[in-house]
Amino acid sequence: QINFRTMTMSTSPIIIVPARLASVRFPKKLLADAGGKPLIIRTAERIRSQAPEFDLFFAVDGVELKKVLELAGYNTVLTSPDLPSGTDRIAKANQELQKEFVINVQADEPLVTRDHILSLARAISKPRVSISTLASVFQTESDFLDPNQVKVVLDNEGNALYFSRSPIPVSRAKESKWGNEKTARGYKHMGLYAYNREFLEFFLDSKEST
């Protein structure tokens, strides 16, 4: 059990939310109304209520999001709108923040829980762990078959082996049905991550060298 209160300011995990307004599938989704407030503010409030002990930053792609968040009292780091992924945005933001451990919560994830955040914080604070993510067992066959739900195959120690939108793993046994003990139900990838600073630096360096 890790006591985050006893960790130093430099080693205690922080939360960075990568926030991109120029979404291709849903432009300005993060500013869409969610019960009277922008979606990104709902996410921010949820994170703050669930994990108030963690410093929270938003890595934004422009001044519009920056103004909305700062007006509501949240910290932001301005990053290039041309960055291709949330991990790129977090890595660039952490070049400025220089934190040892970073938890990545998606900007459109207003249902994130304290357990999610603490699980990632514990995992990334362990020795020899450079990146961690979350997965949960599928509860229904319809979700398992849904291509919009990302699946992950794990080894016996919980390490991710393979990600896919296809229903994996699948038993070859003809008599296997959903929920049958012979059928592996599969895990849903939850899209939450944690990284250490060394991994984020390596991530950026590897891109710059290609």
Where are these regions (language model features)?
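Short, high-confidence coil segments that cap the C-terminus of an alpha-helix
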Residues: 53, 99, 126-130
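Short phosphate-binding loop-to-helix
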Residues: 57, 63-122
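Residues that recognize and position ribonucleotide moieties
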Residues: 24, 110, 193
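Short, Lys/Arg-enriched N-terminal segments with co-localized hydrophobic residues
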Residues: 1-8
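Hydrophobic/aromatic residues located in beta-strands of well-ordered beta-sheets
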Residues: 15, 56-58, 102, 132, ...
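Conserved core of the sugar-phosphate nucleotidyltransferase
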Residues: 113-206
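N-terminal glycine-rich phosphate-binding loop and ensuing alpha1 helix
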Residues: 11-60
